[in-house]
């Protein structure tokens, strides 16, 4: 066990005499020049208008976003897997159609 005076020694070893009354840029200089200005450019005051990316969305798109937002993690992963499988199947179908077009010579450029 530690001695009764050991606690005081431990506390005195934790005292820091560092002066922290400087401005934060002096304490934590910017590591990547320009990052602060870039981040500040995206801080918009709170307004009633929707963000630019949301202005082009239709009501069906917003409903889909709400639906995806309400899914659990497992359900969302299933949805993503389904989309990946669909994209893969579409790629296979496109490959077959391109091969078919090649054999039918419909993709060749006309000879001059």
UniProtKB/Swiss-Prot annotation:
Question: Could you tell me the Gene Ontology terms of the biological process aspect for this record?
Answer: regulation of DNA-templated transcription
On the tree of life, the source organism's domain of life is Eukaryota
GO CC annotations, alphabetized: DRM complex
Q: Which InterPro entries does the annotation name?
A: DREAM_LIN52 (IPR018737)
Please give the family membership noted in the entry: Belongs to the lin-52 family.
Task: Relate the assembly described in the record.
Answer: Component of the DREAM complex.
Q: What is this protein called?
A: Protein lin-52 homolog
**Organism of derivation:** Danio rerio
The protein's gene is named lin52
